[in-house]
Amino acid sequence: MSRDYSYEIYSLRQQISTMSSERADILNKISILKQNKSKIQSKKSAISEQLSQYDLIKAKATSNFAGNRRDDFNNKVETLKGSISQWLKNTQNNIDLIDQKISTYTAEASNLAIGMNYASQSLNTYIYLQSQNED
């Protein structure tokens, strides 16, 4: 009496299809994260460049202000520099979190690929066994 492997074949095909869909979703998320990370890094670099120019602005404005007005201007520039420096640090932390998420998703995609490979090998075995039963 021969065994019917139809259920195993069907089940493995469903599992492979599900894993393939999940992997495609994850790869899409990785792509989006990488694109957005690039945009964030570009903006961060531009703002960092602008921050380096603030001391030049202060130096150029020396003749326009004197006394308390000068001190107020310098304080405002320093406060702005501090706020921007904090923003740059926070942005770098966010970039690091994006990198961690990309690594996590990459590992998940790799695990799904391994699972799909194993399921495909099992599927091929069951298809072979089923074909032997039909002979």
Task: Please provide the spans of the model-predicted regions.
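Pro/Thr/Gly/Ala/Ser-biased low-complexity repeat segments characteristic
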Residues: D72, K81-L88, I95
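Short, charge-rich amphipathic alpha-helices with coiled-coil/heptad character
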Residues: M1-L33, Q92, Y126
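Secondary-structure edge/capping motif, primarily at the C-terminal ends of alpha-helices
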Residues: I26, I30, K58-A61, F65, ...
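Generic structural concept
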Residues: I9, R13-I16, K37, K44, ...
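Long amphipathic alpha-helical coiled-coil segments
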Residues: K29-Q41, K89-M116
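Alpha-helical segments in soluble extracytoplasmic regions
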Residues: K29-K60
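Preference for long, well-ordered alpha-helical segments
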Residues: E108-D135
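Short coil/loop "hinge" linkers that interrupt or connect long alpha-helical coiled-coils or helical hairpins
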Residues: E49-L80
